[in-house]
Regions:
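Generic structural signal for helix capping and beta-alpha/helix-loop junctions
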Residues: 72, 111, 134-135, 349
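Alpha-helix-loop-beta-strand connector modules within alpha/beta enzyme cores
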Residues: 75-101, 153-160, 164
Length: 361
């Protein structure tokens, strides 16, 4: 019978990682994702792929990709790029079933990032920077409980998040999700997609390897600079001068002002803020083409008939507040379009009134 290693989760603890790497029955080959800054990111990936293929052909069944802080004059390949490139190379050569890809990742911290690693080929993930952060916070008493307990809670949360992600795709086991590539890429060019995420949809294209190389070097320079404060960035919470948020305080405040005052002039100011912002969503890139010879307005359907084909998405009471739920229904009724009550329907007091949703789910 074949010898097998069984783990209860693709997110490894330190003990599980060491047990896996030091198992006498499996040959392990470790690859540091650090490369000399004199070569390009794309060249470093090509070297990594060749070395991994050679190791697998020599019988190494566990490939350990390690992403950690590099020394000066060195850079590190992002673990997702590395996992994707290695996975695709092994698949193309018919070697993927001969090896498992385990990654010690500093860049993967939340459920989406870890799901991406697994979805693009990783067998298991050890999120080292997340654990180091939890250890530091526990030692400074900023988190209740011991470091061991907090790391266990973190893994439990990640596992729940992964189960939620895969279940939404109709998948019940992590082995079925591994390498499935059930993603759409936003903002990466064909050269990166072809090498690291082959056949994954990337509709609007975007950055090339050269762009990522420049960003990587800039980030390395910033990380080594003697700054008094670390830039938090504002990815999760809005910070002035940080990551742009579509619903930032200026826009939200103006919308609230327009709603409370009922002033069309204030609403126009809100609309102008939204329309003139830098692209933050795919819909911001949508532009209506102007034709040279407009169609005679009498030759097309009237607005009232066209509006009948519009509907608002079904959203249940609870997901929306009662006021918002009723306002949507009332607005769509006034337009002559269709609203949708969402799951659970609506209060019978709204029946046969302007606040009644036309569609019932």
């Amino acid at each position: 019978h074949a010898r097998r290693l069984v783990t209860t989760s693709p997110v490894l603890s330190y003990t599980k990682l060491q047990s896996l790497l030091n198992n006498p029955y499996f040959k392990v080959k470790e690859f540091d994702l650090v490369f000399d800054s004199d070569i390009s990111l794309e060249a470093a990936l090509d070297i990594l792929k060749a070395e991994v293929v050679s190791a697998v052909k020599k019988g190494n069944s566990i490939i350990h990709l390690v992403e950690e802080m590099p020394d000066e004059n060195y850079l590190s390949i992002n673990s997702l790029l590395a996992v994707g490139a290695v996975h695709q190379e092994l698949v193309s050569l018919g070697l993927r079933s001969d090896a498992n890809i385990v990654t010690t990742s500093s860049s993967a911290r939340d459920t989406h990032q870890i799901a991406c690693l697994i979805g693009f080929g990783a067998t298991a993930v050890y999120p080292t920077l997340a654990y180091q952060t939890i250890l530091d916070l526990s030692m400074r008493k900023e988190l209740k409980g011991s470091a061991h307990e907090n790391c266990a809670r973190y893994r439990k949360g990640i596992n729940k998040g992964l189960l939620k992600i895969i279940s939404k795709m109709g998948i019940s086991t992590i082995s079925s999700y591994r390498g499935s590539q059930l993603f759409e890429i936003v903002g990466l060019g064909d050269d990166i997609v072809q090498k690291c995420f082959t056949n994954t949809t990337s509709r609007i294209k975007g950055k090339s390897f050269q762009d990522l190389d420049v960003e990587l070097r800039s980030l390395d320079e910033y990380a080594r600079s003697n700054l008094a404060d670390i830039n938090v960035g504002g990815l999760l919470k809005y910070i002035h001068g940080g990551e742009y948020h579509a619903y930032n305080p200026e826009i939200v405040k103006k919308l609230q002002e327009a709603v409370s005052s009922g002033s069309e002039a204030v609403y126009r100011q809100y609309a102008e803020l939204v329309d003139n912002r830098a692209p933050a969503m795919l819909r911001d890139l949508l532009v209506l083409k102007k034709i040279q010879h407009p169609q005679d307005i009498k030759a097309v359907e009237p607005v009232k008939k066209i509006l009948k084909r519009f509907d608002s998405a079904g959203m249940s009471l609870g997901a929306l507040s009662p006021k918002a739920h009723e306002t949507l229904a009332e607005a769509m009724n006034h337009l002559g379009a269709r609203s949708n009550s969402g799951e659970g329907g609506e209060d019978q007091e709204r029946f046969y009134k302007d606040r009644m949703a036309i569609g019932k789910t």
